[in-house]
Structure formats: structure tokens, C-alpha cells
A protein has these predicted regions:
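Nucleotide-activated donor-binding/catalytic signature segment of Leloir-type glycosyltransferases, i.e.
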Residues: 248-269
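Glycosyltransferase donor-sugar binding loop
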Residues: 37-43, 178, 208, 235-249, ...
């Protein structure tokens, strides 16, 4: 099955969609053979080591990514693919795909990647108001024209209908997750410790993601400051790109609380260092205000690391029910309870949670199932066309 992914960027710092597409492209052995067309600059460093074909049509001059080359490119190349996957909303990708494929027999899917969560309507009402004209003129029709609109959980699918009053499309919930690590955990841990030597030989909790207000980073720093004295040997690693230049303010908060030496900021970590960070952590923590899935959650579980999540992570409830982690509200009190519950667990309870995390990952979040599902959708679409 030959599949084309259309997306704004493959930059790992852009978050989950970039990582998920990279993982999907690794499943050629089961028939998922793909290429990617992006708005990236051809000289972008993150494109240099990819093992699959990429067609960078950038650079572009805005986050929307209007590019007059994209529609003709898709029209000229669509015959090489059994189907096309549009990743994300609110960029030119979706409109270009719909225009290029109009009147053809090439099906396309739209992967929303959480971008229809009503959180954004409430957190950024002005931005939401500005999106209405584009929704009415373009984005809604991009979804209406798709063979299927993909969601990663039933909760995400239901929440999507609360963002805009026009929501007639054909939804489909796909299994989603991550690809687990391959290699020696001890070697990977040492690679991480080389990048963050302050926690070598120490106990730590791990936050791994963008340093962004949506992720609840301030809640985590404030909660850790309040409970630091309850477990004086416990450290916190805040790993991820700081796109909002916010970490300095958070570090100042830690300094005023007298715990700056126990919170560490290694920046974005990737590859073996990332897996080493997961393997070395007591638990992964994500007090996010909105998370349609959270690839880092699945990656932590793949390493047998328990996860401490807010109830706004759409998969948090099923993980808590599996005994692989804890779930609390996305508030300061909720984040405090996550830390309190973790500190109160016994070594045996932590071992059991780690075992459940690994088992739950294998049962629920193996990304190979995502690849098989997308293949099946395109097989069905082409059979009926």
C-alpha cells in the first residue's frame, strides 16, 4: 500500500504528528510504504537522516503555509499512491489536498491530531473567533470531503463536535501509540546521563514534551515546590523544546522556592537519550490541560515507566484503570495529588505499576496497529470507488 502524508513540517520540535509519521514510515515490512510532502525548507537539518522519501516544497512565509506548488504537485503525483493522509488542521495542507483530489478516485483521510478539542475554544477565544471564517469556507469542507476523519480515542471524537456547530463528517477512531525502543536500556540511560549528569545516580520524575502552557508545566513546578520537602531525594527533569521562551520564568519560580538544584532542564532530547530518560525515571508526569493522546505517554509505558497524568489526557482513564498510572485533575491541587500519591506508593506497588505499564502498551498502544488500520481504510476506499 503506497501512502502519501501531507503535513506542514517533520521538525521533531513541532510535537506528536511529526513523530507519529516517522514511526508509520518504519512499517514497510507490513506493507505501509510511504512518502511525505511538507512545507519544510529542503535544507532543514531534520530532513537529512530520514530513511523514507520526503518532498520539501518550502520554505513558506507563514504558519498557515500557503504554497502554490502543493496542489500541482499532488495532482501530478497522486497516481503513485493508493491514498493520502492529511496531518492536522488550520494549514494549507487540507485545502490543497481537497482541491487537488476533487473529481478523482484518490481517497484521503484527515488526521486531526487533537486540533478540534474544545479546550482551544475556551483557552483562546479570540483565536477561535478568527478561525470561524476559515472553518466555514474551507476546513469544514476539507473534513466533509475526506473518506474518514481520524481520531485517536472515542473521547477525542466526541469532544471534536463541541468546537464548531458544523460537524458532519465520517469519523473513525484508530488505534494510536508509539514504537518501542530497541537497544540496551543501560546503554541508553548512560547516553541520557551524559546529557543530564545532574540526575545520574539519583531518583527523578520525568516531564518530556514542549515547555508550553498547554502542558501544565507551571502546575508541575509549583506542585513539586510544595512537596519537595516530603521526599528530599526526588528530582524533576523538565525535558523539551522551549518554543515560548517560558523556561526562564519557571526556573525563577524554582529558584524562589529554593529547589532550583532539584529541577533540571536538558532541553529537547531525542533518540537513545530520550529512551534512556524514560528508562531511568521513576515515573513520567504530564499535567496537561489538553492532550488528545500524548505520544510521550505511550513511549514511557513502552519502557515500563508508570505515568502520572491529568484527566485532560484523553487516554488517562483507561491507563489508570489498567493500573499503569494515576489520574487527577489538571489543577494545582490535582498535580499535588499526583505527586502525593506517587510518593506514598511502596516499592512493590511501583514494580506492579511498571509491569502494568509495559503490558498496557503492548495491548493498547503499539503503533503497528495504526499502520494496519490505515492500510485497511484505504483498501476499503479503493474497493468501493
Amino acid at each position: 500500500m503506497r501512502i502519501l502524508h501531507v503535513m506542514g513540517t517533520l521538525d521533531p520540535a513541532a510535537g506528536g504528528p511529526s513523530q507519529s509519521v516517522r514511526v508509520l514510515m518504519s512499517y514497510a515490512s507490513i506493507g505501509y510504504v510511504g512518502e511525505v510532502v511538507t512545507f519544510d525548507d529542503p535544507e532543514a537539518p531534520w530532513l537529512k537522516t530520514l530513511a523514507f522519501p520526503v518532498h520539501p516544497l518550502g520554505p513558506v512565509g507563514s504558519t498557515y503555509g500557503f504554497n502554490p506548488r502543493l496542489v500541482p504537485w499532488i495532482r501530478a503525483n497522486r497516481h503513485r499512491f493508493d491514498g493520502i493522509v492529511v496531518n492536522g488542521l488550520w494549514q494549507y495542507c487540507g485545502l490543497a489536498a481537497r482541491r487537488a483530489l476533487s473529481g478523482t478516485d484518490t481517497p484521503y483521510l484527515v488526521f486531526t491530531h487533537g486540533m478540534l478539542d474544545p479546550y482551544f475554544k475556551h483557552a483562546f477565544p479570540l483565536k477561535h473567533a478568527k478561525k470561524w471564517p476559515y472553518w466555514l469556507l474551507a476546513e469544514y469542507w476539507n473534513l466533509r470531503g475526506a473518506y474518514r476523519v481520524l481520531f485517536t480515542s472515542e473521547a477525542e471524537k466526541q469532544l471534536a463536535e463541541e468546537s464548531f456547530w458544523l460537524h458532519r463528517w465520517t469519523p473513525y477512531v484508530v488505534p494510536y501509540g508509539a514504537k518501542g525502543p530497541t537497544g540496551d536500556p543501560e546503554t541508553m540511560k548512560q547516553i541520557f546521563f551524559d546529557q543530564c549528569p545532574q540526575v545520574n545516580g539519583r531518583r527523578y520524575l520525568l516531564f518530556l514534551g514542549r515547555i508550553h502552557r498547554k502542558k501544565g508545566c507551571d502546575l508541575l513546578v509549583d506542585a513539586f515546590a510544595k512537596l519537595a520537602a516530603d521526599d528530599p531525594e526526588l528530582h524533576l527533569v523538565m525535558a523539551g523544546p522551549d518554543q515560548q521562551q517560558w523556561s526562564a520564568e519557571l526556573q525563577q519560580t524554582a529558584l524562589k522556592a529554593g529547589i532550583a538544584a532539584r529541577i533540571h532542564w536538558p532541553g529537547m532530547i531525542t533518540g537513545d537519550a530520550k529512551w534512556g530518560a524514560f528508562y531511568g525515571a521513576e515515573a513520567f508526569i504530564l499535567p496537561s490541560h489538553q492532550e488528545n493522546f500524548g505520544i510521550a505517554v505511550a513511549e514511557a509505558m513502552a519502557c515500563g515507566t508508570p505515568v502520572l497524568l491529568s484527566d485532560k489526557v484523553n487516554i488517562a482513564e483507561e491507563i489508570a484503570n489498567d493500573g499503569a498510572g494515576f489520574m487527577e485533575s489538571d489543577t494545582l491541587d490535582g498535580t499535588l495529588r499526583l505527586l502525593q500519591r506517587w510518593i506514598a506508593t511502596s516499592p512493590r506497588e511501583r514494580e506492579q505499576m511498571a509491569e502494568q505499564a509495559a503490558a498496557s502498551f503492548k495491548q493498547r498502544y503499539d503503533m503497528q496497529q495504526t499502520a494496519k488500520t490505515i492500510i485497511g481504510l484505504f483498501e476499503a476506499a479503493n474497493h468501493t470507488s
